Amino acid sequence: MFLFAMGLLLVILQPSTGQFPRVCANTQSLLRKECCPPWDGDGTPCGERSNRGTCQRILLSQAPLGPQFPFSGVDDREDWPSVFYNRTCRCRGNFMGFNCGECKFGFSGQNCTERRLRTRRNIFQLTISEKDKFLAYLNLAKNIPSKDYVIATGTYAQMNNGSNPMFRNINVYDLFVWMHYYASRDTLLGGSNVWRDIDFAHEAPGFLPWHRAFLLLWEREIQKITGDENFTIPYWDWRDAEDCVICTDEYMGGQHPTNPNLLSPASFFSSWQVICTQSEEYNSQQALCNATSEGPILRNPGNNDKSRTPRLPSSSEVEFCLTLTQYESGSMDKMANYSFRNTLEGFADPHTAISNISQSGLHNALHIYMNGSMSQVQGSANDPIFILHHAFVDSIFERWLRRHRPMLEVYPAANAPIGHNRENYMVPFIPLYRNGEFFISSRELGYDYEYLQEPALGSFQDFLIPYLKQAHQIWPWLVGAAVIGGIITAVLSGLILACRKKRKGTSPEIQPLLTESEDYNNVSYQSHF
């Protein structure tokens, strides 16, 4: 009944947030290279009259890139978004959005001054009604068109440098599938030539911040289309799972009774159509995915290549990964050793942190294990398990941030693969976000994880941790000081005892006010560090 009721909202609710703003997907905006739409609240570009923001030229990072992409001027995603726009809204204070009409993550209220912290929960801890509501929200997103965003169906060159716009409407769920595809697609070099060693969302430092921003935008989109401001994406804790416990009709869809590669007809996910899964066809045609339906979701969990991924990740592998102190290292790609990012992403062995691209660990392991739509990078977001999986991966990233408390400078400023330097703007988001802006605690972005919350002691422990670390560093000195203090105390005690023995024969006028036994019974002692 709840699912039916949600279906009725399809003709009522409208979404927002994604890739190309509809109001900027026209010849005039493309030729002017400007995307500074008016805010509805006052009718001025970027809400300038209300002091929300101004239309400004985009300042691009000039930091050098790594050697992985040896071309320049051949891909629309280079120096994002300058091929399409060189002027966008720069929002002030806590305002955000392509027209500064929204609040930054973690803020709410008319003037975006109210802090708000939401909690992402384990999907198996949701009540039946909460779980059904989540599934209904996903189905709603799959069936309602985006009001504010469209997708590009051609390159800038194919658009004749903006004079012939090529954009298309898309539903809210598939908008995010397309964005994931667009960020990870190959570079089209002309003819039948492509460059595959490029990815703006994977295999480099931006993997974790990019997906963090991606989920936050997806989460906010669902909040908007449902009117449920408290909605958060649940996570699936897959550590030590023996099989795909989430793959049931009660949750994300069971297995088809006669075709193990399909979903059970009892799950409405079985009727979903996938997009952006035929990368070789796009490459041969030198075309972009245009969001045409390409068939049902494929999933055959556990029937993958066991030599590459023998099982789902374990708790011990996650714990080892969290001990790694370097966020990034070496070449800062899938060949990086002792890199927390590369180990969590799954290109390095989860027991040694040495790169091994013949195996798939941690994050990658789950994608391979699903053995279907989720196992191909560009189209993996078609399977709704993607959301649950990446929410848990993000929670591991959050654990590492809280444990090691890195400075922003730990995130590489230069020489990372294209699009992954700290100040690079993330492809393909408009409004613009830099990689470094999401290399911070989730609490600063307005959300937490149920299993990471520390109810009473959290804030106090956060306050103490830096001082405890300093104490740990000077511990040898503290021990030495304690030993010396003990010696001095012993010497002084001996001298005092000797003096007291001498005083036993003194006159009453100079006797102590308390006897030794009274001293012992009535004086309280405190120890100090």
Curated annotation (Swiss-Prot):
Any one annotated GO CC term: melanosome
GO MF annotation terms: metal ion binding; tyrosinase activity
Predominant subcellular localization, coarse grouping: membrane
InterPro entries xref list: Di-copper_centre_dom_sf, LE_dom, Tyrosinase/Hemocyanin, Tyrosinase_Cu-bd
TM spans (from-to): 477-497
Record's catalysed reaction(s): 2 L-dopa + O2 = 2 L-dopaquinone + 2 H2O; L-tyrosine + O2 = L-dopaquinone + H2O
Lumenal, melanosome side: 19-476
Residue positions binding Cu cation A: 180, 202, 211
Chain positions carrying an annotated carbohydrate: 86, 111, 161, 230, 290, 337, 356, 371
Region of interest (Disordered), ranges: 293-313
Claim: Cytoplasm is one of the keywords in the record: no
The family this protein is said to belong to: Belongs to the tyrosinase family.
Function text: This is a copper-containing oxidase that functions in the formation of pigments such as melanins and other polyphenolic compounds. Catalyzes the initial and rate limiting step in the cascade of reactions leading to melanin production from tyrosine. In addition to hydroxylating tyrosine to DOPA (3,4-dihydroxyphenylalanine), also catalyzes the oxidation of DOPA to DOPA-quinone, and possibly the oxidation of DHI (5,6-dihydroxyindole) to indole-5,6 quinone.
Name of this chain's protein: Tyrosinase
Organism this protein belongs to: Gallus gallus (Chicken)
Lineage: Eukaryota, Metazoa, Chordata, Craniata, Vertebrata
Chain's gene name: TYR
